[in-house]
Design a protein with these regions (language model features):
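N-terminal signal peptide c-region/cleavage motif recognized by signal peptidases
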Residues: 18-20
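Bacterial N-terminal signal peptides that target proteins for export
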Residues: 1-9
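Catalytic domains of carbohydrate-active enzymes that cleave complex glycans
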Residues: 277-284, 290-303, 307-343, 348-365, ...
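Ligand-binding face of N-terminal immunoglobulin V-set domains in extracellular IgSF glycoproteins
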Residues: 24-181
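Hydrophobic helical h-region of N-terminal Sec-dependent signal peptides
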Residues: 9-15
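Catalytic-core regions of glycoside hydrolase
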Residues: 199-473
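C-terminal edge beta-strand
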Residues: 179-190
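Extracytoplasmic low-complexity repetitive segments enriched in small/polar residues
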Residues: 69-74, 83-85, 190-192, 254-261, ...
């Protein structure tokens, strides 16, 4: 109690110091949660106040500070976060806090009628990055006159953090002058999230185009593997499993009917991510493992017999390593009716190699592929017909139709795409209400997909690419409009030293990637509650927010209310279970 009183007194004195002795001009500032996208001209709220957050151990939780000054531009603006101090002297070190500058992208075309042109926040430039721990040049910055500047503040709560109430301060400076001291409170629940996502993911990443964006051209395979490693690690830190990488399959020799595969370089690339050593004890999410990995095949496998032998070696190797349950064979992407016979033949050939090789196809359930498909991954639009709109999918297959496949130990994944906003068009009424990863949509749309995955009992989420805009000559930091959407297929931006400072190349995360991770963390709450009770208990919480695949509450306050109530319920039931155990 004395410690809490002392901290409160210190905070009060600091705030008095700011109000009496800060250099002019003083800022207008406010805080928001992570589900508000603040535009440059948004009107500041009338009340300045700090923020209160809630999180489990081994969870990231973010908020935003927005700065503005209408009288003049202000140079040398910086933000520093203190340690978070909690019960009985517990401390969450400020080294677990990352401060990001939110850069605006000027969008020239809307993604849909729900979108909009103008400046939207999305690229995040760290003050000190989590990958190389280098100070970057986004801070200090000049606060432009008459414009809002949002800052993303990300707190990681380490495993085994003592539950309870924590307090900290975010100090805003201009040069050496303190302009604001913003109180931050964090309540840590009595439970912990796992490091590895309970919902499987496979998000595409093309290391070849990433290298070209960072180096200007393809240089060599070592550089290709290196840039792929840092992006794959970045994805894992966001609870996402990347597939593709350098796109280099392990080499083989084929002599006298025998197939030999050299796994050395491949295992060095993927092994740490599959074994849980890519993120060590000193990293967030220690021991996190990727939940999926794709089979890479060779163009030089010129006969079916060679393909069968090569794929069989994949299964043997992955079985020996304990990785087999996460291996999938991406047979075909959105095949047409005319392509179905060929797709079925390729899938059957993979099963000829070994029936344990899981074949994935992005298609609704169809008799044309009956038999050799193990992972059905239809478009989210293909589960339900939206009333008043023409069917986007042919066919639309309801979720219950997949139940016989699940009883046969098959899996159902899904994905969202340009069908959420309109493919190469400004989408109309049909293209509203769906979960979406474009920039110019409400933040809840970027976060809600895992909630729907729980509601519909979906086993995994597929996404075609996280760096699609890297394939063009244009700088992704200036334009990520593709397939009719702003940011469609692009969740990262290239962090080049000549642009962001430092000595090393890193991926820059997007606000949307942060929100995807928030949704995956929400999913863990559903798992925890269902483990304490049953699945129906978690369903009731999800149903408060999600009605169907195209209808959910877009209001940030609704999501945060449900999440807080859900966390309190998990804590209450956990206490009750521990009490019965005693």
């Amino acid at each position: 109690m004395t410690s809490l009183h002392t901290r409160s007194l210190i905070l009060l004195l600091l705030m008095l110091l700011v109000s009496r002795g800060s250099a002019k001009p003083s800022f207008t500032w406010w805080t928001t949660n992570a589900l508000v996208k603040t535009m440059p001209s948004d009107v500041p709220p009338s009340i300045q106040q700090g923020i209160t957050l809630h999180a489990a151990s081994n969870e990231f939780e973010a908020f935003q500070i927005v700065l503005r000054n209408d009288s003049a531009a202000v140079p040398d603006v910086d933000v520093e976060m203190s340690d978070l101090t909690g019960p009985s002297g517990s401390v969450i070190s400020s080294s677990n806090v990352t401060v990001y500058f939110e850069r605006y992208l000027n969008l020239s075309r809307p993604s849909s009628i729900d979108g909009g042109v103008g400046e939207w926040p999305d690229p995040l430039i760290p003050r000190v990055d989590r990958y190389e721990h280098e100070r970057r040049n986004a801070f200090p910055f000049t606060l432009a006159k008459g414009r809002n500047q949002p800052l993303w503040i990300e707190i990681y709560v380490p495993p085994k953090t003592r539950p309870g109430h924590y307090q900290a301060q975010a100090t805003v400076l201009s040069g050496s002058a303190i302009q604001a001291v913003i109180p931050v409170s964090l309540d840590v629940w009595e439970f912990e999230l796992p490091s590895t996502s309970s919902l499987r993911t496979a998000f595409g990443f093309n290391g070849v185009i990433a290298l070209k964006q960072h180096a200007g051209r393809y240089t060599n395979d070592d550089d290709l593997r290196s840039i792929s490693q840092v992006y794959t690690r970045a994805a894992l830190l966001h609870r996402v499993s990347a597939f593709g990488g350098p796109l280099i399959p392990p080499p083989f020799t084929h002599k006298a009917g025998a197939m030999t595969v050299d796994w050395s370089l491949y295992d060095a690339e993927v092994g740490p991510f599959l074994n849980g050593t890519a993120l060590s004890k000193g990293d967030p999410l220690p021991g996190a493992r990727t939940t999926s990995v794709e089979l890479r095949t060779h163009g030089s496998l010129d006969t079916d017999k060679k393909k069968v032998l090569y794929w069989r070696e994949w299964v043997r190797h992955f079985d020996k390593k304990g990785w087999l349950s996460r291996l999938f064979n991406y047979v075909s992407d959105e095949p047409t009716a005319a392509q179905m016979p060929g797709v079925k033949k390729r899938a059957a050939l993979a099963h000829e190699a070994d029936h344990r090789l899981s074949n994935l196809v992005t298609s609704p359930l169809t008799r044309a592929l009956d038999g050799p498909i193990d992972i059905w991954s239809p478009l989210i639009n293909c589960f339900e017909t939206k009333p008043g709109s023409p069917d986007f999918c042919e066919p639309t297959v309801p979720r219950r139709a997949y139940d016989p496949e699940i009883r046969r130990h098959k899996s159902v994944w899904w994905y969202q795409s340009c069908a959420s906003h309109g493919c190469n068009i400004v989408g109309g009424e049909y293209f509203t209400g769906w979960p979406s990863y474009v920039i110019d949509t409400g933040a809840v749309s970027n976060r809600i997909m895992p909630w729907m995955s729980w509601k519909y009992r979906i086993d995994g989420e597929l996404y075609y690419n996280m760096v699609e805009a890297y394939s063009r000559e244009a700088d992704p930091l200036e334009d990520v409009f593709l397939h009719g959407g702003n940011g469609d297929g692009t969740l990262f931006y290239p962090g080049r030293p000549n642009a962001i400072g430092g000595a090393t190349h890193i991926p820059l995360e997007s606000v949307r990637l942060k929100l995807i991770r928030e949704g995956l963390e929400d999913y863990e709450y559903f798992v925890l509650l269902s483990n304490l009770t049953d699945s129906a208990s978690a369903d009731r919480w999800v149903d408060k927010l999600v009605h169907n695949t195209y209808t959910f509450s877009p209001l940030p306050e609704d999501l945060y209310r449900v999440r807080q109530e859900l966390g309190d319920e998990i804590q209450r039931r956990g206490r009750a279970m521990r009490g019965r155990g005693n």
